[in-house]
Regions:
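Short polar/charged helix/loop
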Residues: 3-220
Length: 220
């Protein structure tokens, strides 16, 4: 069974230990109040949409190529939500262009304990990502917002890069959109610093998703 290691925490049972680790996550974000505003907006959007749709709240993380940041955000967000017992959230990712799930992003997840397996027989390169619940792997592949696999109405759009935020002035069907840009680890591709930079970006995203879903768990 995969053992996903959370940044700063090193714990497996997030739900049972929420009161111990969440204050540390909050403390880590105290020095970036503008970031907390964006993260709190995402928390509010998820809770507001839950009142409208009653059942499943869909969150779509968007970056230009749907290759690195949006894929990392989808995986971390869904894994953390699942671990916290937040069963009404389904996370997705998309891009303004279709490329592929970058190997360096996959490596960053594997370094945290995820198991990633390439799926055979798919028209588009696809991977199954196994987190803390191996019975329900995530199906990850690069796609645009028009892909059939994505919700078309009443979803939350989270842009994870400035380029996607500018490139999608209107996102049809979105209940709300949140700008949550991350620096692109792509600049390190092909250099000795790549593994470290991707790990840093993965950890940053994981920490912020711990904050978002930790707040939601605390409100239930």
């Amino acid at each position: 069974m995969p053992f996903v290691v959370y940044p700063l925490l090193g714990v497996k049972e997030l739900k049972q230990s929420h009161d111990r680790w969440f204050p540390e996550v909050q403390r880590r974000l105290m020095d970036v109040p503008e970031r907390q505003i964006a993260l709190n907006a995402l928390v509010g959007a998820i809770l507001d949409l839950k009142k409208v749709v009653v059942q499943t709240v869909h969150v779509v993380f968007i970056c230009t190529h749907n290759s690195r940041r949006s894929q990392l955000a989808q995986v971390w967000a869904q894994c953390i939500a699942d671990d916290l017992g937040i069963d009404f959230v389904r996370c997705h990712s998309a891009g303004t262009e279709q490329t592929s799930f970058h190997p360096n992003a996959i490596q960053a997840l594997e370094d945290r304990g995820f198991v990633v397996k390439q799926l055979d027989g798919k028209a588009i390169e696809s991977h199954a990502v196994y987190g803390a619940n191996p019975a329900h792997p995530l199906h990850c592949f690069s796609k645009t917002l028009e892909a059939e696999a994505l919700p078309k109405q009443d979803f939350i759009a989270v842009t994870t890069c400035d380029e996607a935020d500018r490139g999608c002035p209107v996102i049809p069907g979105a209940f709300r959109r949140i700008a949550l840009p991350y620096s692109d680890p792509k600049i390190s591709d092909g250099t000795p610093a790549a593994r470290i930079m991707y790990a840093e970006r993965s950890s940053e995203i994981a920490l912020e998703m711990l904050y978002v879903f930790g707040r939601i768990a605390g409100s239930q």
